[in-house]
Amino acid sequence: MRTQWPSPAKLNLFLYITGQRADGYHTLQTLFQFLDYGDTISIELRDDGDIRLLTPVEGVEHEDNLIVRAARLLMKTAADSGRLPTGSGADISIDKRLPMGGGLGGGSSNAATVLVALNHLWQCGLSMDELAEMGLTLGADVPVFVRGHAAFAEGVGEILTPVDPPEKWYLVAHPGVSIPTPVIFKDPELPRNTPKRSIETLLKCEFSNDCEVIARKRFREVDAVLSWLLEYAPSRLTGTGACVFAEFDTESEARQVLEQAPEWLNGFVAKGVNLSPLHRAML
């Protein structure tokens, strides 16, 4: 039997770079919120212990795909602790709607959905803490998707505090470019010393993203989309880009602006949600 699992997008409602560690990783403070929009992952169980991704991504080797890596990591971790039923395997496919290099967390969300779904389907019984710890080895954003609640993140993104920001409507726009995270983090002009503040203080301040100035400078497409959106509503970059978003109080307001969008702007309207659609589906 084939089952389907949500793999939602996320937004960084704010993102501040507070420093850089000796190993090169940047420390940050950011606010994650999910969207009721994303990819859909389909899983059909196998009994021969094999993992197959039926919808390969162009330019990404099968074993390098985060979906396959997540499945194999769960398989190994569960097997090593005697919690993997004999023959556990899966055929996995994905209906991909989230762009790569968009700052919406698509790859991290895919990995988290596979960890959570296969742990359930295989009946491994790993805890949420164990899954989140495994997820961190796949990517800094994976744990927040595993835990499934909007969160204030610190460190390199792995220290999570659940929060409940307002669930607004967003017009999310893709400028048509892909921005690899290292391009932003290696830029010498990236702010790296924003003072650390408490979550209480940050929630009272106007939200912004330290990466935005670099993305706008290096990618004129990002600058053009943000300039257009800012005429209608508070707007900013998510993650390291390339996607940007404008926030609205109602769905109709967001859709009215999208209807006025120039032809070169690709976007969608979605609601911010504090409980991940993946975890809502499991209730």
Curated annotation (Swiss-Prot):
What GO molecular function annotation could you give as one example from this UniProt entry?
A: ATP binding
Task: Please give the pathway this protein is involved in.
Answer: Isoprenoid biosynthesis; isopentenyl diphosphate biosynthesis via DXP pathway; isopentenyl diphosphate from 1-deoxy-D-xylulose 5-phosphate: step 3/6
Q: Cite the SUPFAM superfamilies for this sequence.
A: GHMP Kinase, C-terminal domain, Ribosomal protein S5 domain 2-like
Q: Quote the EC number.
A: 2.7.1.148
Binding residues for ATP? P99, M100, G101, G102, G103, L104, G105, G106, G107, S108, S109
Q: Which reaction does it catalyse?
A: 4-CDP-2-C-methyl-D-erythritol + ATP = 4-CDP-2-C-methyl-D-erythritol 2-phosphate + ADP + H(+)
One Pfam annotation, family name? GHMP_kinases_N
Listed under GO biological process in this entry are: isopentenyl diphosphate biosynthetic process, methylerythritol 4-phosphate pathway; terpenoid biosynthetic process
Q: Which residues cross the membrane?
A: none
| DNA-binding among keywords | no
Question: Quick check: keyword Kinase in the entry?
Answer: yes
Q: For this UniProt record, give its keywords in alphabetical order, as a comma-separated list.
A: ATP-binding, Isoprene biosynthesis, Kinase, Nucleotide-binding, Transferase
Where along the chain is the active site annotated? K10, D141
Q: How is the subunit organization of this protein annotated in UniProt?
A: Homodimer.
User: Matching NCBIfam families, A to Z?
Assistant: ispE
What biological function has been recorded for the protein in this entry? Answer: Catalyzes the phosphorylation of the position 2 hydroxy group of 4-diphosphocytidyl-2C-methyl-D-erythritol.
Q: Which HAMAP family match?
A: IspE
Q: Which family does it belong to?
A: Belongs to the GHMP kinase family. IspE subfamily.
Any idea what this protein is called? 4-diphosphocytidyl-2-C-methyl-D-erythritol kinase
**Organism in which the protein naturally occurs:** Escherichia coli O9:H4 (strain HS)
Query: What phylogenetic lineage does the species belong to?
Result: Bacteria, Pseudomonadati, Pseudomonadota, Gammaproteobacteria, Enterobacterales
